[in-house]
């Protein structure tokens, strides 16, 4: 068992220590679906309602959602990925807590964010995960990149929100710009190059030239 204490870093714990109980170990984790354990007899130990949330296909944080995201801002992107991977819906508390931790995203490295997004893009319910990413406005945050020894902030995918509620020609499109994009991505085979191309194929539509 182990426990963690977080500090100024947006992702890595400041201190890791051994814990005395399974409960202490479980309560430091991110989502209830990741908070179950199994003993040596093959019995599932569920202290956080993980089985209930699996049954109801709900992604929920363990404990206070705002605190979980404040501890590790990468969990914001993991939430989007797990929604896409498991075909779950995020809980109301999770969605409400996300924006309160956006100020921590600027401390995340571009490499870590890109890794989470790439995994999301290959997930079975990719449209669900992308919808959380964009509708929550997480895609408009900036992360950190280091070039030539100097760190700077770079926006993640701010262009995508422009597609939300963007009118389209009704003779050719059933949905607005964003849900049309999600439909295209969903019907594209799970190849990174193809799905990224599908996601960005209409990103400049309606923008000033």
What annotation goes with each model-predicted range?
Residues 1-209:
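Catalytic cores of the polymerase beta-like nucleotidyltransferase superfamily
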